């Protein structure tokens, strides 16, 4: 599907460690890293390719030319779109997709689409298992570093930080 409907609206595209490793291998990661983030919407950290604040659509979508800038190496989620897999069955994740019911699909194309949906599912399961652990390790380390820094501060410096935090809350 290459109509751009999904690409121009989605603000956070799920990505996996497999996507990131492939982009590193293919020399694309440096250009994408500023758009890779962590989404906490579901309660657990998930890797995403996201637009900058205030921008709409996938950051890799060129809305003027209606093209994906990384079409040759797009995220697994995009390769499978609009097909998804949940571990037991395949389903259409976006029934509003303009490509549904348009043209024909042969057995080989269907197999490719199904494989992409399964690859996306498996890669995201792996990433979604590891990201929360890595997030916890990194956040724990940051808290420890902050605590150690606070131990070396004077009472006056600590009071200044508390004042700043109070101002931020108001």
Question: Where in this protein do the model-derived segments appear?
Answer:
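Short loop/turn segments that flank or connect secondary-structure elements
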Residues: 1-170
């Amino acid at each position: 599907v290459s109509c751009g409907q999904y690409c121009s609206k989605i603000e956070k595209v799920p990505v996996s460690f497999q996507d990131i490793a492939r982009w590193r291998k293919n020399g694309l990661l440096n250009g994408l890293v500023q758009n890779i983030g962590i989404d906490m919407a579901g309660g657990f950290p998930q890797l995403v390719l996201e637009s900058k604040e205030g921008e709409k659509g996938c950051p890799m979508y060129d809305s003027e030319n209606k093209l994906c800038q990384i079409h040759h190496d797009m995220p697994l989620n995009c390769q499978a779109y609009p097909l998804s897999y949940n571990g037991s069955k395949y389903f259409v994740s976006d029934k509003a997709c303009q490509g549904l019911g348009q043209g024909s699909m042969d057995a080989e194309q269907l197999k490719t689409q199904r494989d992409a949906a399964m690859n996306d599912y498996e890669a995201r399961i792996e990433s979604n298992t590891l990201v929360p652990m890595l997030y916890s390790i990194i956040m724990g380390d940051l808290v420890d570093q902050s605590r150690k820094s606070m131990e070396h501060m004077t009472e006056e410096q600590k009071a200044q930080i508390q004042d700043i935090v109070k101002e931020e809350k108001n």
